[in-house]
């Protein structure tokens, strides 16, 4: 019997099986294709790598990045696109490229760069999933990585300043959402009544943006005006993830939000404490290193010591 396929990914909240877009893409595709994945949610007991999440562990190998994981699943006969025509397959590749170029930078900015969102939602949530003291370090690194990823792809002339880049990525993201809404129309999925790879990608990118409660919501507000995209996300959640979610009542979600607020305060206090300790250590006077005294041997002792070194 073949070893089960195990997917390591970030966990969920706000009614989502995962708050991480790339993890959601793989989870949705596995549901659509019937791939029997065992999901291992990363929490504060996790000791593995988090840099390339999601990670698919097979009997012989480890696969990371959504595109590579989906290709592996297709080779294992778990193909959500088997009913698509050649043109629909080409459209899928074009739309995925559009999502990664036009929508992903705005999603990264909303979660990791927008200051209010990062400090009140993103940082405390991810810190709660990571063991101490990495919980104080890794979210910051992930934030810098997201910013570098945005600037690498969008910080080209004539957009030199971050504010110019921010304005452009949100314009592009809204245009992308409008295009997706027009393409979906009144259909259940993008290519009819059966979900495919494109549906997994769109769901993975849109669902966190739609469900997570942010203080700064300019792109979220635009998305919520596109009712067919919101219905698309809700239908996938209710049809494919209902049992795994267990349902969160409004009262329960308020409890989650209250706990997150407490966690935010705790993480910020710990971060401030470590910064103060670091500043104190840097400012404290540093004593010169002590030199060990050199013992001088008498001629007789030197002769005896030399003889002992030569002895077996």
UniProtKB/Swiss-Prot annotation:
GO biological process terms on file: inner mitochondrial membrane organization; mitochondrion organization; protein transport
Coiled-coil zones: none
Subcellular location, record wording: Mitochondrion; Mitochondrion outer membrane
GO CC term, one of those recorded: cytoplasm
Keywords: Membrane, Mitochondrion, Mitochondrion outer membrane, Phosphoprotein, Protein transport, Transport
Residue(s) carrying Phosphoserine: 249, 284, 311
UniProt cross-references to SUPFAM superfamilies, sorted A to Z: GST C-terminal domain-like
Tagged with keyword Protein transport: yes
Pfam families named among the record's database cross-references: GST_C_6 (PF17171), Tom37 (PF10568)
UniProt-annotated stretches for the region Disordered: 278-312
Complex and partners: Part of a large protein complex spanning both mitochondrial membranes termed the mitochondrial intermembrane space bridging (MIB) complex.
Family the entry assigns: Belongs to the metaxin family.
Function text: Could function in transport of proteins into the mitochondrion.
Protein name per UniProt: Metaxin-3
Organism encoding this protein: Homo sapiens (Human)
């Amino acid at each position: 019997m073949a070893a089960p396929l195990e997917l390591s990914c970030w966990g969920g909240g706000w009614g989502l099986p995962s708050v991480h877009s790339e993890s959601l893409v793989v989870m949705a595709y596995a549901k659509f294709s019937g791939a029997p994945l065992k999901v291992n949610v990363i929490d504060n007991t996790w000791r593995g790598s988090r840099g390339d999440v999601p990670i698919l562990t097979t009997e012989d190998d480890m696969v990371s990045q959504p595109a590579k994981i989906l290709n592996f699943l297709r080779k294992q006969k778990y193909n959500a696109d088997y009913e698509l025509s050649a043109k629909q397959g080409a459209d899928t590749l074009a739309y995925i490229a559009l999502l990664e170029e036009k929508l992903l930078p705005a999603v990264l900015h909303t979660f990791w760069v927008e200051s209010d969102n990062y400090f009140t939602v993103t940082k405390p949530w991810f810190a709660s999933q990571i063991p101490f003291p990495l919980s104080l370090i890794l979210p910051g690194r992930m934030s810098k990585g997201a910013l570098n990823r945005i600037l690498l792809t969008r910080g080209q002339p004539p957009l030199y300043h971050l504010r110019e880049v921010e304005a452009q990525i949100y314009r592009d993201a809204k245009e992308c959402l409008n295009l997706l809404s027009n393409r979906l129309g009144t259909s259940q999925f993008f290519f009819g009544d059966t979900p495919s790879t494109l549906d997994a990608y769109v769901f993975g990118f849109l669902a966190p943006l739609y469900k997570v409660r942010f203080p700064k919501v300019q792109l979220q507000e635009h998305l919520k005006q596109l009712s067919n995209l919101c219905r698309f996300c809700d239908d996938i959640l209710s049809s494919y993830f209902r049992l795994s979610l267990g349902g969160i009542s409004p009262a329960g979600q308020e409890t989650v939000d209250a706990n997150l607020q407490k966690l935010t305060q705790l993480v910020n206090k710990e971060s401030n404490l470590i910064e103060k300790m670091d500043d104190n250590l840097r400012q404290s006077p540093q004593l010169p290193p002590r030199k060990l005294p050199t013992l001088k041997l008498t001629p007789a002792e030197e002769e005896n010591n030399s003889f002992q070194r030569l002895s077996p």
